[in-house]
Amino acid sequence: MTTSCPPPSISDREEQARILCLRLLTARSRTRAQLFGQLAKRGYADHVSERVLDRLAAVGLLDDNDFAEQWVRSRRANVGKSKRALAADLRAKGIDSEVITTVLAGIDPAVERERAEQLVRTRLRREVLSEDDARVSRRLMAMLARRGYSQTTICEVVVAELAAERERRRV
């Protein structure tokens, strides 16, 4: 049985850090900052962590740009998060501001508003409308606020979609 031997220039500690990073990356994609945090949490020295992470980036296993693009695509499609909420999520994951700006530059405000309208329409189908729209309105506004939409967008979309749903149910 043959085993792969690490190059002689790599210390045992670096090899352990590399194996840990590979195991973490096997589970799911992660940012450089997240991996650095995991290595620090387990007591690896900063210089060891930097060398391992630089090597992973050099071979293409660690790419914050790619991570950010995938994250934005996934969260917009599945959760319906706004540009502002996505930026906050990426900042929390340790992505650079320049990368965040680049990735979010492609989001069109009209498409974002359309997604908010779609979310409200979907939720309204399940709501029972009574004479008092305040409860339904409050719930819809809270849903959009949790997804990071601006107050202006929230108010405009909820008022318009509530009126459209009332008209649709009247017919």
Swiss-Prot record:
Record's keyword terms, sorted: Cytoplasm
GO CC entries: cytoplasm
Ranges in coiled-coil conformation: none
Record-linked Pfam families: RecX_HTH1, RecX_HTH2, RecX_HTH3
GO biological process, one term: regulation of DNA repair
Major site of localization recorded for this protein: cytoplasm
Subcellular location: Cytoplasm
Organism superkingdom: Bacteria
InterPro entries: RecX_HTH_1st (IPR053926), RecX_HTH_2nd (IPR053924), RecX_HTH_3rd (IPR053925), Regulatory_RecX (IPR003783), WH-like_DNA-bd_sf (IPR036388)
Record family assignment: Belongs to the RecX family.
Purpose: Modulates RecA activity.
Name this polypeptide is given: Regulatory protein RecX
Species of the source: Mycobacterium leprae (strain TN)
